Swiss-Prot record:
Main location group: cytoplasm
Function text: One of several proteins that assist in the late maturation steps of the functional core of the 30S ribosomal subunit. Associates with free 30S ribosomal subunits (but not with 30S subunits that are part of 70S ribosomes or polysomes). Required for efficient processing of 16S rRNA. May interact with the 5'-terminal helix region of 16S rRNA.
Molecular function as annotated in GO: ribosomal small subunit binding
Signal peptide start-end: none
Assembly: Monomer. Binds 30S ribosomal subunits, but not 50S ribosomal subunits or 70S ribosomes.
Localization in the cell: Cytoplasm
GO annotation, biological process: maturation of SSU-rRNA
UniProt-listed SUPFAM superfamilies: Ribosome-binding factor A, RbfA
Gene that this polypeptide is encoded by: rbfA
Name of the protein: Ribosome-binding factor A
Amino acid sequence: MPNNFRLAKVSSLLKKEITLILQNDLENDLIRDYFVNISKIDLSGDLQHCKIYITSTAKETVRKEIVANLNTAKSFIRNNLGKRIEMRRVPEIIFKEDIVLDKGLSVLKLLDELKNKHQDKNYEDKDANS
């Protein structure tokens, strides 16, 4: 089992190379039309399996379609990875949507709503006391 340094190094290399493949080699209009970013890579300890989390500026339905297209093209991407990097075995890859950004935005929205309600209540209290 590789150490954490090796996992981090291989993950970083995979992220860099897959990003280049998505930008330059993959001919998919949907992926090219929207900003697609690899936010995180989870690589198994034996370097055999890789989950790639992506974010995009697209709407939720389009993001799901982008993930489906990437999973359809994963053999092409994996094949290109094998040509670009020296590994005994290129890991099996699966693309997933990273929903952390959406969750963060909804938390910020809730906080803004609470702040506005609190400000409105303070304003009403001041009017009542005047």
